[in-house]
Amino acid sequence: MKIDIVSVFPEYFEVMNLSLMGKAQAKGLLEIKAHNLRDWTHDVHHSVDDTPVGGGAGMVMKPEVWSECLDELLGFSRPSDSSAPSGTPVLIFPNPSAPLFTQRDATELSHADHLLFGCGRYEGYDARIPDYYRSQGVDVREYSIGDYVLNGGEVAVSVMLEAITRLMPGFMGNPDSIVEESYTGEGALLEHRQYTKPAVWRGIAVPDVLLSGDHGKVDRFRRDEALARTAEIRPDLIAALDCKALDKADRKTLMALGWEVSAAHPRRLAD
């Protein structure tokens, strides 16, 4: 996968050379390049922002600088090109006002050949930038990573990149390690809690069933704990489950947790 990142702080992404991300680049699974948006400016101050039209606080990133940069990285030969060239990357902008980035989005994007991320700063980027490239046939995505605001898009891009790339075949040393993770697959739940040795630490024991050697009981315990944790922390995920896909033990557990499971989707009895 090829990944291009545009930022006024490209050095921020040197962290991508560490850990599994760095190993994936060394193996040729990833090619990551960070570009400095100021390289496409033409004034002595290398300005990338201007005051907001209509007034207001802060500064807004200028569309003409972004367009020169994106035209080049997207392979547009001239501004009048009427459609995106073949093989155009998916163009992604972090935006706190956009839809939430989810594991499903990460899974979809992990199959892409080329991703291009644009990092906003200040009050953000001119809204015409994503609108224009959508009109040219580019697959433009805008995502939020949560209900909070950051100083810029670099942190959000790093979060999305890690979520996406770790799902690529060959990225993880043990591919089974992502199978039972939180939010993974259809009927996604939060993951069960994890333990390691020693069996007793500071008076707190690992649950006995995990030491039993009975894989069936261990699997059931973990599944029940995942259901219980999800019901407590993210009941919306329980409510989205397909009751037809639940086995008898799942139904029993959810009923004990106060959920009704006879309809298409579980419903809390207190609702």
Swiss-Prot record:
ATP-binding keyword on record: no
Protein name in the entry: tRNA (guanine-N(1)-)-methyltransferase
The keyword Lipid biosynthesis is assigned to this record: no
EC nos: 2.1.1.228
Principal location: cytoplasm
Summary of subunit composition and partner proteins: Homodimer.
Role played: Specifically methylates guanosine-37 in various tRNAs.
Gene giving rise to this polypeptide: trmD
Keywords for the protein's UniProt record, in alphabetical order: Cytoplasm, Methyltransferase, S-adenosyl-L-methionine, Transferase, tRNA processing
